[in-house]
């Protein structure tokens, strides 16, 4: 890994930029809800005003990327059509319609007469976001950061530098026109700076990587800054003996082909041995007709699959039209397989037996456990979060798709009237611990 990525110490220029964002984030954290909504609307207006320049920059990025032979998948994510840009601009406005995540009272409690405790949500501070070639992510992430009262340092893929620069220029213009500090949004354009970000623990409070598995793992292992993200998306779907066959086929197909490059697409299908013959009889031609390469264990090969799986396949995130199939004896074997190979992202079961479903969902330790539905629903927008900054597969919160609520933390506010602990020790005062 060391020969691919290095973590250099930040130079003076980067330190200066980071400090400007830090100072701007302090100002933004003190703003009222109405001011942040106003800022988002100004940001959207400036994006509209600069649409022509943004699209021209994207066209230049796209042409350059094509000449360099960048993959079709990356080119697709890089392309910013007028419709996609307009959708992104509308998304910025819609973030302003979401409930304010800041200053929400989670606990209000009288500890004693005249001694009141509150726990309230507060902005995290400065977000460091390293993402792939999608320029629309700049609009989404920046709007979420401002809405939650945070500053943000962005580093996109070099293939989108012109587009990202043009978008950030418009966003900063909008912030400035709204009366907020434009330094709350900062874009880095060099690979060296993106790696040096990992050593900015005095300035950045949370790193959010949105890129390849290799990059995410490297970041998790090489920074002292907390990281919100997931390296792998190895998702499973278990077809139980009591599954509705037509439902199982429909959900399995959607979970794989609706968008195979997504982290919530399934990579392994587990099938109960007693339903396997009937299921595979229909599933094999169905998946074949949708250009899905099926790789299976010996039992599934005996039932018609052409390619036998290796041990490596069970722990591979294909992000492609490839699906591993394993036939299991029962629910217990399915759970054991999932617990061994799952990345704890999203795993599902298809069954008409509610008791079986509940056991599966209670035992499988993933951020999302689904019953009778596609794993592709594991998404912040589909959950009704309005927008998603990333997905976390860690056990501690935030977990799963992370929206605005994952971009705030909390602190305790204790207000008294000269209260001292010694009075309680001497019996002069008593704790009431009464929720208000």
From Swiss-Prot:
It is found in: Cytoplasm. Belongs to the gamma-glutamyl phosphate reductase family. Gene3D superfamilies: Aldehyde Dehydrogenase, Chain A, domain 1 (3.40.605.10), Aldehyde Dehydrogenase, Chain A, domain 2 (3.40.309.10). It is an enzyme of class 1 (oxidoreductase). This is Gamma-glutamyl phosphate reductase. The keyword Amino-acid biosynthesis applies. It comes from Prochlorococcus marinus (strain MIT 9301). Keywords: Amino-acid biosynthesis, Cytoplasm, NADP, Oxidoreductase, Proline biosynthesis.
């Amino acid at each position: 890994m060391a020969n691919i990525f290095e973590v250099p110490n930040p130079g003076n220029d980067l330190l200066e930029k980071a400090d400007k964002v830090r100072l701007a984030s302090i100002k933004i954290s003190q703003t009222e809800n109405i001011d942040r909504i106003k800022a988002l609307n100004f940001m959207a207006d400036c994006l509209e005003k600069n649409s022509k320049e943004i699209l021209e920059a994207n066209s230049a990025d796209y042409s350059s990327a094509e000449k360099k032979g960048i993959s079709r998948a990356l080119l697709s994510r890089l392309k910013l059509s007028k419709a996609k840009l307009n959708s992104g601009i509308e998304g910025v406005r819609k973030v302003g319609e979401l409930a304010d995540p800041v200053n929400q009272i989670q606990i209000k409690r009288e500890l004693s007469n005249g001694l009141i405790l509150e726990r309230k949500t507060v902005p995290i501070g400065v977000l460091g976001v390293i993402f792939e070639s999608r320029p629309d992510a700049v609009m989404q992430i920046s709007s979420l950061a401002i809405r939650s009262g945070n500053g943000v340092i962005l580093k996109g893929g070099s293939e989108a530098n012109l587009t990202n620069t043009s978008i950030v220029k418009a966003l900063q213009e909008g912030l400035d026109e709204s009366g907020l500090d434009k330094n709350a949004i900062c874009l880095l354009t060099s690979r060296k700076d993106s790696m040096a970000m990992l050593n900015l623990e005095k300035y950045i409070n949370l790193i959010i990587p949105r890129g390849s598995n290799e990059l995410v793992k490297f970041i998790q292992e090489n920074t002292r800054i907390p990281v919100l993200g997931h390296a792998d998306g190895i998702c499973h779907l278990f077809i139980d003996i009591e599954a509705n066959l037509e439902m199982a086929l429909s959900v399995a197909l959607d979970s794989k082909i609706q968008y195979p490059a997504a982290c919530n697409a399934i990579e392994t299908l587990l099938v109960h041995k007693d339903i396997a013959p009937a299921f595979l009889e229909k599933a094999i031609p169905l998946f074949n007709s949708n250009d899905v390469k099926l790789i299976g264990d010996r039992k599934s090969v005996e039932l018609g699959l052409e390619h036998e799986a290796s041990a490596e396949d069970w722990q591979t995130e294909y992000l492609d039209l490839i699906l591993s199939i394993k036939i299991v004896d029962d629910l217990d074997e399915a759970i054991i397989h999932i617990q061994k190979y799952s990345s704890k992202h999203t795993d599902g079961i298809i069954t008409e037996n509610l008791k079986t479903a509940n056991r599966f969902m209670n035992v499988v330790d993933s951020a999302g456990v689904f019953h009778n539905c596609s794993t592709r629903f594991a998404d912040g927008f589909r959950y009704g979060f309005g927008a998603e900054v990333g997905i976390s597969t860690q056990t501690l919160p935030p977990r799963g798709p992370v929206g605005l609520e994952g971009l705030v933390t909390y602190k305790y506010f204790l207000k008294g009237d000269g209260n001292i602990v010694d009075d309680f020790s001497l019996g002069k005062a008593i704790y009431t611990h009464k929720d208000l």
